[in-house]
Amino acid sequence: MSNLRTLVFYATPEHPCSYLDDRLATTMFVDPKADINLDLYTRLSQLGFRRSGNHYYKPRCNGCNACIAVRIPTEEFNRTRSQERTWKRNSDLTVRLRSAQFEQEHFALYQRYISARHQDGDMYPPTLDQYESFLLEARSETLFIEFRKDSKLLAIAVTDRTTDGLSAIYTFFDPNEDKRALGVYAILWQLQFAREQRLPYLYLGYWIRGCRKMSYKTNYRPIQVLVRDSWITI
């Protein structure tokens, strides 16, 4: 069984940054053959690593530290007035926890979401292979959180459970339901669920100053940022 001291890491060649124009990025990732158990996954999350499919990675770019890992302490979190309105607006939804397995209904919603929201990104056009490798080929304790209005599926939040929290992997939702702010609601729900489960943190990935797609993460306060391997509350 692998441990942090025996892990082997690799680095990708420089490639165009997905978040900041005119920047080159390098990604450090764990050897895909490594046996990542729950404790090791937790430690990697604490060090700022993220999971995508079977890959655990962290930005390691020359001359750039723009990607800052963030997490929310669940016991200290308080909703803003806007977030409270979003919470109440979606009180008519039912929530169900599912395991990570293929469902045609889930994939159809994913296709609609990517096609409507991310035509300018490398996830478009959405394919079955991409969907499965991204969200289903996990060796972790992964949950698919379904949000429904009556029988209609409106959103899916994919999240991993670690020993110290939840790690929000991806959320996709009905692009015709903008007024519900389902992306916000999914984060609020995970925060509430983690608190009820006595899990101290919700990991949200990377906050990137100057990147509109990532700026929303600092709307959840208090928030902790990883700076020089130490978590600091801002």
Curated annotation (Swiss-Prot):
First-listed, main subcellular location of the protein, grouped into a coarse class: cytoplasm
Q: List the record's Gene Ontology CC terms alphabetically.
A: cytoplasm
Q: Which InterPro entries match?
A: Acyl_CoA_acyltransferase, Asp_Glu_LeuTrfase, N-end_Aminoacyl_Trfase, N-end_Aminoacyl_Trfase_C, N-end_Aminoacyl_Trfase_N
UniProt KW Acyltransferase keyword: yes
The places in or outside the cell where this protein is found are: Cytoplasm
Q: Identify the keywords attached in UniProt to this record, alphabetized.
A: Acyltransferase, Cytoplasm, Transferase
Pfam families, per the entry: ATE_C, ATE_N
Q: Can you cite a GO biological process for this protein?
A: ubiquitin-dependent protein catabolic process via the N-end rule pathway
- According to its UniProt record, the EC number is 2.3.2.29
Keyword field contains Magnesium: no
Q: Name one GO molecular function term.
A: leucyl-tRNA--protein transferase activity
User: Could you tell me which SUPFAM superfamilies the record lists for this protein?
Assistant: Acyl-CoA N-acyltransferases (Nat)
Q: Which cysteines are joined by disulfide bonds?
A: none
Q: Which reactions are catalysed by this chain? A: N-terminal L-glutamyl-[protein] + L-leucyl-tRNA(Leu) = N-terminal L-leucyl-L-glutamyl-[protein] + tRNA(Leu) + H(+); N-terminal L-aspartyl-[protein] + L-leucyl-tRNA(Leu) = N-terminal L-leucyl-L-aspartyl-[protein] + tRNA(Leu) + H(+)
Q: Which domain of life is it from?
A: Bacteria
Q: What does this protein do?
A: Functions in the N-end rule pathway of protein degradation where it conjugates Leu from its aminoacyl-tRNA to the N-termini of proteins containing an N-terminal aspartate or glutamate.
Q: Which family does it belong to?
A: Belongs to the R-transferase family. Bpt subfamily.
Instruction: Specify the protein name.
Output: Aspartate/glutamate leucyltransferase
